[in-house]
Regions:
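Fe(II)/2-oxoglutarate oxygenase catalytic core
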Residues: 1-170, 178-193
Length: 193
């Protein structure tokens, strides 16, 4: 008998929504509580970065690949990434089958960050993920780690479309300029992605 590496069983996709605009949403049963707790631990140890906009503080975040090794290679972070990658793999397989021109392409998950946005703050500038410094990016992925707040949608400019946050919701979309987007601010509680 093969034992599951996940306490409580593997995280699974419980609902998939493929929109006509190449944005896909995947609801999962991923418990994100310990990911938020891990972020808080990293923050308490002074390892988060505050991002600022012209209006002041925007959000705080941690780039997982930039953490000192003693904060990254422990049992908790391994468990978090095992589950994160498991959900990513399921969603990406489904996305690729939906858009079969992608079948046979190689995808690499090169960077992960956890981000906290406080009420009224956030990075509201329209942007897209494929930039001159990262032209290799083809698909962006995001997991909403919590809900329980008003606002906080991810808004896509040219699609006139918003994704509503829900804990465990995984989103995939193309990185090119046509999917210019922004994170709208949460209005009354912290938002974690």
């Amino acid at each position: 008998m093969v034992m599951s590496p996940f306490a409580g069983g593997e995280p699974v996709i419980t609902k998939s929504i493929h929109h006509d605009n190449f944005i896909s949403e995947f609801e999962t049963n991923l418990d994100c509580t310990d990911i938020i707790d891990y972020y808080k631990f990293i923050s308490e140890n002074g390892l988060t970065i505050k991002r600022h906009s012209e209006k002041g503080a925007a959000d705080s975040q941690v780039f997982m690949h930039e953490l000192p090794v003693e904060y990254f290679h422990d049992n908790l972070s391994r468990s978090i990434f095992r589950r994160w990658n498991y959900v990513t793999d399921q969603a990406l397989r489904e996305y690729v089958l939906k858009y079969d021109i992608l079948v046979g392409r190689r995808f690499q998950h090169t960077m992960a960050k956890i981000q906290k946005t406080e009420p009224g703050q956030g990075y509201h500038a329209w942007h897209y993920e494929s930039t001159p410094s990262a032209p290799y990016r083809k698909l962006a992925t995001m997991i909403y780690l919590n809900d329980g707040f008003e606002g906080g949608e991810t808004e896509f400019l040219y699609q006139h479309f918003r994704v509503t946050p829900k804990a465990g919701k995984f989103v995939i979309f193309p990185c090119d300029w046509a999917w210019t987007h922004r994170g709208n601010p949460p209005l009354n509680n912290d938002k974690y992605i």
